[in-house]
UniProtKB/Swiss-Prot annotation:
Presence of the UniProt keyword Cytoplasm in the record: yes
The protein's assembly and partners: Monomer. Binds 30S ribosomal subunits, but not 50S ribosomal subunits or 70S ribosomes.
Annotated Gene Ontology cellular component terms: cytosol
One of the protein's GO biological processes: maturation of SSU-rRNA
Protein name as catalogued: Ribosome-binding factor A
Species assigned in the record: Thermosynechococcus vestitus (strain NIES-2133 / IAM M-273 / BP-1)
Pfam families linked to this entry: RBFA
The organism's place on the tree of life at top rank: Bacteria
Family: Belongs to the RbfA family.
Amino acid sequence: MATERRVARVAELIKREVSQLLMYEIRDERVGAGMVSVTDVEVSGDLQHAKIFVSIYSTEEVRRSTMAGLKAASGFVRRELGQRIRLRRTPEVVFIEDRSLERGSRVLALLNQIGQQQSTSEVLES
């Protein structure tokens, strides 16, 4: 079992390497169709499994297509990680769509809308 510090370092290294792979190495058109960014990586304590959370800025149809492309490219990503990172065993890679940024921007838009409505009602009351 790896220490928490080592797990965090490996997760950060995987995040950086997968980001590079997404930008320059993966040739699948489905992956390039939407703007894809790696938001987080969770690595198991034994360094055998890596959950890679990705944020995709595009339509729902393109998101599904991009996730299918990432799933198809997971073997390539694992092989490249094995060549770039020195680990006894290369972790299994799973891509998971992260919609937290989308939800956060929607909440901010709603808060801005509420703020505008309050300022408008204050002006009307004056």
